[in-house]
Amino acid sequence: MERINTTFYKTKVIPQLQQKYSYSNVHQIPKLRSIHLNRCLGAVSQKIFQKSSEEIAMISGQRPKITYAKKAIAGFQIRKGMPIGMTVTLRRERMYDFLTKFIHLILPRLKDFRGLNPTSFDGNGNYHMGLPDQLAFPEIDYDQIDQYRGMDISIITTAKTDEEAKFLLEALGMRFQ
């Protein structure tokens, strides 16, 4: 298991990208910009919200930012200004640490994992995926969770096309179907 960091990116990934796409400028070479973790809970009790916030903090290594409802939706029992979710943005070393853990520990632990879906790119070189539950993360203790809650993970790159982004992520170690 090789640790993904800026040195790995510069020594292993950049030469592969340069060889395949022949960039004329080093600033054209795609790189990771950030990783976003997002969890939406809706109308839940303060205790559940706090526990979920602690889980995201353990998974990401930093405290999440709370997101609030912009408008009231009676069908979902949500009022304006009510906390409904949380998000974390990882950059620099924390981003590379999370990506290393995600590729080498979390993805192999997912049930029936045969590779990531290659159609989950957004057309701008970013990759988005959802996890059904939090049990794949080694920081989460099975006995301490009360309900399975998934999360969305977005990997933001500077790639101009999905093809470049897919090649970048494959060079970093992600497997696609």
From Swiss-Prot:
GO terms for biological process: translation. GO terms for cellular component: chloroplast; ribonucleoprotein complex; ribosome. It is found in: Plastid, Chloroplast. Keywords: Chloroplast, Plastid, Ribonucleoprotein, Ribosomal protein, RNA-binding, rRNA-binding. It comes from the Eukaryota. Belongs to the universal ribosomal protein uL5 family. Binds 5S rRNA, forms part of the central protuberance of the 50S subunit. PANTHER family: 60S RIBOSOMAL PROTEIN L11-RELATED. This is Large ribosomal subunit protein uL5c.
